[in-house]
Amino acid sequence: MASVLDALWEDRDVRFDITAQQMKTRPGEALIDCLDSIEDTKGNNGDRGRLLVTNLRIIWHSLALPRVNLSVGYNCIINITTRTANSKLRGQTEALYILTKSNNTRFEFIFTNVVPGSPRLFTSVIAVHRAYETSKMYRDLKLRGALIQNKQLRLLPQEQVYDKINGVWNLSSDQGNLGTFFITNVRIVWHANMNESFNVSIPYLQIRSIRIRDSKFGLALVIESSQQTGGYVLGFKIDPMDKLQDAVKEINSLHKVYSANPIFGVEYEMEEKPQPLEELTVEQPPDDVEIEPDEHTDAFTAYFADGNKQHDREPVFSEELGLAIEKLKDGFTLQGLWEVMG
């Protein structure tokens, strides 16, 4: 079985010009806010667009040309702040700056609300990203966390305990450690009976396989985590055999239910409910230009984070455009910035 995480890219990637299918919400993803009249000031200055805020990412797309779009996963975000930017539609105005890192490349995004006086651009994105950051226990494998209090599992907001199994040996050491299993709707938690701080929390999101395998301690429950977390193999000994089989059956069943509709743990309620994402995304009309999928261009370089830039570069006259523009960085051409990434 493949883990949900191995197929999940929405919160863990920055992508440009995604397909209409990729703009749709995946299972467990929910649209939280929709903001019209938002300008992508860095990459598409002067182009009015729409910003969609989900529990996993933000999506911006041009209203005039929906295939011009971008998707920014919250896990890629390094910093969010507000600064003054120069917008073609608003002039000098306060904008949302988002610094990200994806595949060892830093991208910077600047979003400006074309409609003056509305703080929702800032409040929605910042608040939802904070909710994502504070709910990592739903999504990340955690060792030695503050999981247990008075021998009881400290429940997450959307969590329910389905089973508690005593007498479970953790096989991570030569002699093993006796402890207790908690099986919930979002994760499996084990802690040592003699030391509650010796524990592990394994979200279903991270689980690649659950099976019974032979070990030096005899048959054991073996959990393999996703490749993105390093592919950990965790072994647990449960006696008698029928108790072990029941535990594996129960965990596999709950993992299957979770995989069909994951709980990512990001909770944020808007006063006004947005329309479903399918109704908001504009169907991309076919055009008569064929784009070769294997042909890569550098259109996304407009979003590269320019860490040394403190001020706008001096204006220079562009013969190609017939007007003054900010001087391009070395190695960049107007032609390269106009090309659409395939």
Swiss-Prot record:
Record-level Gene Ontology MF annotations: phosphatidylinositol-3-phosphate binding
Q: Where is the signal peptide?
A: none
- Where is this protein localized, as stated in its record? Cell projection, Cilium membrane; Cytoplasm, Cytoskeleton, Microtubule organizing center, Centrosome, Centriolar satellite
Enumerate the UniProt keywords alphabetically. Cell membrane, Cell projection, Cilium, Cytoplasm, Cytoskeleton, Membrane
Q: Which GO terms describe its biological process?
A: camera-type eye development; camera-type eye photoreceptor cell development; cilium assembly; gastrulation; heart looping; intracellular transport; Kupffer's vesicle development; melanosome transport
Gene Ontology CC annotations of this record: BBSome; centriolar satellite; ciliary basal body; ciliary membrane; cytoplasm
User: Which Pfam families does the entry link to?
Assistant: BBL5 (PF07289)
Listed as disulfide-bonded, the cysteine pairs are: none
State the InterPro entries in the record: BBL5 (IPR006606), BBS5/fem-3 (IPR030804), BBS5_PH (IPR014003), PH-like_dom_sf (IPR011993)
The keyword Membrane is annotated on this UniProt entry: yes
Q: How does it assemble?
A: Part of BBSome complex.
Query: Per its database record, what is this protein's job?
Result: Required for ciliogenesis.
Q: Which family does it belong to?
A: Belongs to the BBS5 family.
Designated name of the protein: BBSome complex member BBS5
Per the UniProt entry, what species is this protein from, by scientific name? Danio rerio
Its lineage reads: Eukaryota, Metazoa, Chordata, Craniata, Vertebrata
